[in-house]
């Protein structure tokens, strides 16, 4: 399925959540924190507000966006102002 965000929205594929600590302790699902990083998969057509492009790694607000599944993979649709940084 192909999803094209509208306006100033951005489609992000979140990074995988860590399931193990550096010391080897397994973190249960209930204790795992939602990741705030991901890769931009698609952008809307509002070029004035959107300052990122497809393929860039970004950090977003913790509770922002709408979670959707595309072909069984979790994604987030975020407003461009919910993005807080680009990871270089």
Swiss-Prot record:
GO BP terms, alphabetized: chaperone cofactor-dependent protein refolding
One Pfam match: Cpn10
SMART domains found in the cross-reference section: Cpn10
Primary localisation category: cytoplasm
Domain of life: Bacteria
Keyword vocabulary terms for this entry: Chaperone, Cytoplasm
Subunit comment: Heptamer of 7 subunits arranged in a ring. Interacts with the chaperonin GroEL.
HAMAP family: CH10
Protein family (similarity comment): Belongs to the GroES chaperonin family.
Purpose of the protein: Together with the chaperonin GroEL, plays an essential role in assisting protein folding. The GroEL-GroES system forms a nano-cage that allows encapsulation of the non-native substrate proteins and provides a physical environment optimized to promote and accelerate protein folding. GroES binds to the apical surface of the GroEL ring, thereby capping the opening of the GroEL channel.
Protein's recorded name: Co-chaperonin GroES
Lineage: Bacteria, Pseudomonadati, Spirochaetota, Spirochaetia, Spirochaetales
Gene: groES
